Amino acid sequence: GELGQTDRFFVRIINTTVSEAAHTLTSEKEERIVTAVFGIVSEDMLDTPNTTFIDPLRLSPRLNKFRRNVIHLSPTLEQQLFVLASHLQSIGSSKALAVICSEESNDIGDAVRRTLAEFDVPLESVRTRMDGEALDGYLPAGGDVFVIGLSVADVEVIAKKLEKHSALRVIVLFSDVALLYDVFSVAFNGTTGCERLVFATNLPHWSDATPSSVTVQRFHTALSDPKMWTPLSLLAFATGRLMQSILPRMEKVGSDTLANFFYADSSVVVDGMRYGVFDDIECKPAGSDLEVCASNYGATQISVRSMSRTFNASIALLAEPMTPSMRFRDPNEGALTRAQLIGVVVGTIFAVLLLLALGIVLCVALRNTRDNDSAPKEFTDPVTLIFTDIESSTALWAAHPGMMADAVATHHRLIRSLIALYGAYEVKTVGDSFMIACRSAFAAVELARDLQLTLVHHDWGTVAIDESYRKFEEERAVEDSDYAPPTARLDSAVYCKLWNGLRVRAGIHTGLCDIAHDEVTKGYDYYGRTPNLAARTESAANGGQVLVTGATYYSLSVAERARLDATPIGPVPLRGVPEPVEMYQLNAVSGRTFAALRLDRKVDLINDESDATDGVYSECGSTHGELSHSAQTIMMVLCALIGTFTAPQREKLLIPFCERWRVSLPRKTGTAWDENYSREVVRCIALKVGHVINFDSSAYDFDDLPVSMRRQSSFIVLSHQLMESIQETTQQGPSGSDEVARTCV
């Protein structure tokens, strides 16, 4: 930049030769402050100290090596191979070859073999071609051929070969397409072979006359001449837009701080294009609790396309955009050493006997999971009740709707296996909350402890849930200056030992209950002060925390207490309880720390048929809360949707919504599911969903949200007529919510 101008983005073009490029850059740094280098670079330029390279484009194919100061926005060679191999698997490729011209031919060949093996694509051979050697003799008459490393003359050879052999498909790197774009355009435009020249990129179509991409729309506005619409110019434009987006967010711009930005923010979204995740933490050894690998590449949504689409944007993609996981199977997985093989043979007999015995035990135990024999039935005997709930489940469903169904199913399976193991009784399950009854207080405490251990050691197959929890904590820290995130800022090595996957809170209380047998479910239910206190205890806990009341703790023998790691918390005031309750924290996972108890939380007891005298809070009780604007909107939409259905049909429609959103059904005034009751259920759903909508929309301006966040957030789009109707309704005053309720017929 220039003296006194600190709020501008200066770009300087340097013309040099490959041999002089590194020296030219060094000379430039002696005269000017060089923060970053963009565009085409030589290999030795990347070794220049105190310089950050943003999306460097190399003239010769190279595998990516982690350099913290090199940030790749375009797909790396490895990413392209991964996406292209996935495409070949999907079309049933029967024969693949590779022809490589590079100083790293051997290493690139190994990468090709590994990637194709991952997708079970047969690889016939990998051949190395010397620089300057003719390509014609390397191309067969058929099959799928990776040609990695091209010269100007090679393009014409490929065009003629594809025109001559219709069974041949050639796959090239996008960097070669971008660098030799003019040559490709002349050689392939109007030929039939362009349909079988294939490459992969994360760029939208640069010459689409009616683009849907915001990046391309702005690109065309900046460059009105279609002759300038090339891959290289779009790459430069997208990089410039990225810099325009991130530089204002940096207090001080320098080479190191620029690189730090990518690794600190992890992921960046500009004009609908997402880059990341970037990570500068080195890989841990295989088999560690949390595999973390350094990553300086961030291309996402990489699609496979033919050269014919380059000339005609209406031609469909060969493969829809995907973000490669870059995870590979261990080629030695399953292989046994001689000693291991001997051990397996010797232990087979014992293993068979052990499995047989274990199978008998599990069959008996699982048969009793909902067996009423395990239910406490004597009203004169104390019952220990456990309430569990997944922390931030609604937010997790909003962030990961495709993932949470499997995660919650796993959560249910793990809890039920422990219920069977400890001879406990599953009273009921609503959404992701469990109510469990135990005859033994010690069995209940052990069950809750082992639940935390089981969850933290389970292989969830993703780190997305953990990332979301940490993000939620950081967002709360921004809103509340007094809040210190207990896990978000932990070192990864520490975090993976303490936390993993879903976080479940649990509350345990022991006491006498009113016990009733439900003729509909054929199961037992528990009422009175004991379930209320257990529910309130659970509600006060944080995710991953187990709270035990003094009543439960002192129900344990001295020997049983000695086997537990419990920390006294002292008297805790619970909502609706006149006196503070003595509380203990069960340290199931040693080393965990938690935020302050959630004493300001309202309780929604799983037992939705509890007596009103129990004092349990319910949003759908007789004293209705005021419907927010969002809730009124939701209620009107639901009313309009179900208005044409009969009462039994409405029941079938609304029950799944209640289960998914964890909405407790209001108490029935009669026995039938009539129109009035349907209206009450709709109102409960609207209240719950309205809270989420208000929470999501209060923190962000929709227009400012990245596209990826818009897809993950909850929004309702309304017509102008419906909005006017809502506004008229709300202008009627306090009775507006009742008016909305009356329209639900």
Swiss-Prot record:
The record places the following residue ranges in the Cytoplasmic compartment, namely 363-745
Q: What is its EC number?
A: 4.6.1.1
* SUPFAM superfamilies the UniProt entry points to: Nucleotide cyclase
State which residue ranges cross the membrane. Answer: 342-362
- How does this protein lie in the membrane? Multi-pass membrane protein
Q: Which InterPro entries match?
A: A/G_cyclase, Adenylyl/Guanylyl_Cyclase_3/4, Nucleotide_cyclase
Q: Binding residues for Mg(2+), per the UniProt record?
A: 389, 432
| Swiss-Prot/TrEMBL cofactor(s) | Mg(2+)
Q: Which residues lie on this side of the membrane: Extracellular?
A: 1-341
According to its UniProt entry, what is the function of this protein?
Answer: Could act as a receptor for an unknown ligand.
Q: Which family does it belong to?
A: Belongs to the adenylyl cyclase class-3 family.
Protein name per UniProt:
Receptor-type adenylate cyclase
Q: Provide the species name.
A: Trypanosoma congolense
